[in-house]
Amino acid sequence: RRYQAAPVSMSAATKQQGEYVEYPNLIVNLTNYSVLYKGHSVDMPPKELELLYFLASSPNQVFTREQLLDHIWGYEYIGDTRTVDVHIKRLREKIRDDENWALSTVWGIGYKFEVRR
């Protein structure tokens, strides 16, 4: 299925605000585009980092693929909604679920950053 996102982009709105999110074993810093996982720096492309930051900024909130495309890729993205699935898969390969949090699939709906404690 192809999707054209509405003209809303998370990256333009938040990059300059100096924001970061922190959980046990995970720090995502949007200001300097860095991720620390279990004390180690993790390299990831900007869209993966923005996706992780966006999800982690709204813990336990479920987002559809379309909502994630709107916020991360913005209006210029014209393509398959499954690109979100690919980015989530790559994130999961780089940062494994923790006892305190997880990148969770909500079947039939989308994804969430689940805080377990």
List each language-model region with its residue ranges.
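Short amphipathic alpha-helical recognition elements used for nucleic-acid or partner binding
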Residues: 34, 40-73, 91
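A structural micro-motif at secondary-structure boundaries
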Residues: 21-49, 106, 112-117
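Basic, amphipathic DNA-recognition helix from helix-turn-helix-like DNA-binding domains
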Residues: 1-22
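Regular, well-ordered alpha-helical segments
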Residues: 1-5, 54, 93, 100
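Conserved catalytic core of two-component sensor histidine kinases
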Residues: 45, 78, 85
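DNA-binding patch around the recognition helix
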Residues: 43, 86-88, 92-117
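Alpha-helix N-cap and coil->helix boundary residues
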Residues: 63-67, 79, 83, 98-101, ...
